[in-house]
Swiss-Prot record:
Keywords: Cytoplasm, Initiation factor, Protein biosynthesis. GO terms for biological process: ribosome disassembly. The lineage of its organism: Bacteria, Thermotogati, Deinococcota, Deinococci, Deinococcales. The gene is infC. Residues 169-210 are annotated as: Disordered. This is Translation initiation factor IF-3.
Length: 210
């Protein structure tokens, strides 16, 4: 597979006299004059794109440059999204948190999960609060229950210093599997509808002649 850089010389920007040309399907055409390659690109409704300027002669390819750039931008977006999904966000709660703050902070966690991030939920203990870890566990249970539709806890809560931590991971709905199950059920139902009725049963159900 040829690696095409973000910046390319395209069509009239290519000033060399000869190039090694690759066709739109990846086939090797060979070394030809750039002018002939340009004519070939016009005839096919494609662009002539230099993909390897350091080669001798430079390597060019026939392709739809606009479509290629669009696909490349989509791939870059997916890569950025994948990198973001590997980031772990952090939201901190106090042991003595009121309902308003709990709702606000839980909303932040929900947004991070919706964006595909993992979230470290931290319960911060003060003074003697540390002697009652069950208070922190209760808050973490509330968080997990409030976000059960979008996230799931990874492992058990753990203590680190004066903090109790729990990782929430985005929840992925098994939609494709459900569709396949429904499709199988429909096929089974269709098969049941076309199953022939045994002759003996049909005769038994038929009304008797008087």
């Amino acid at each position: 597979m040829i690696n095409i850089a973000k910046e390319h010389k395209v069509n009239e920007q290519i000033r060399v006299r000869q190039i090694r040309l690759i066709g739109g399907e990846g086939e090797q055409i060979g070394i030809i004059d750039t002018r002939d390659a340009m004519n070939m690109a016009r005839e096919k409704g494609l662009d002539l794109v230099m993909v390897s300027p350091q080669a001798v002669p430079p390597v060019c390819r026939l392709l739809d440059y606009g479509r290629f750039r669009y696909e490349q931008q989509q791939n870059e977006k997916e890569n950025r999204k994948r990198v973001r999904s590997q980031e772990v966000k952090a939201i901190k709660f106090r042991v003595k948190i009121d309902d308003h703050d709990f709702k606000t902070k839980t909303g932040h966690v929900r947004r991070f999960l919706d964006d595909g991030h993992k979230v470290k939920v931290t319960i911060m203990f003060r003074g003697r609060e540390r002697t009652h870890p069950e208070l922190g566990e209760r808050i973490l249970v509330r968080v997990a229950e409030a976000l059960a539709d979008v996230g799931t806890p990874e492992g058990m809560p753990s203590m680190m210093g004066m903090d109790m931590n729990m990782i929430m991971a985005p929840k992925q709905a098994p939609a494709p599997k459900k569709e396949r199950t429904e499709e199988s059920a429909e096929k089974a139902g269709s098969a049941g509808e076309t199953e022939p009725v045994p002759a003996a049963s049909a005769a038994a159900e038929a009304p008797a002649n008087v």
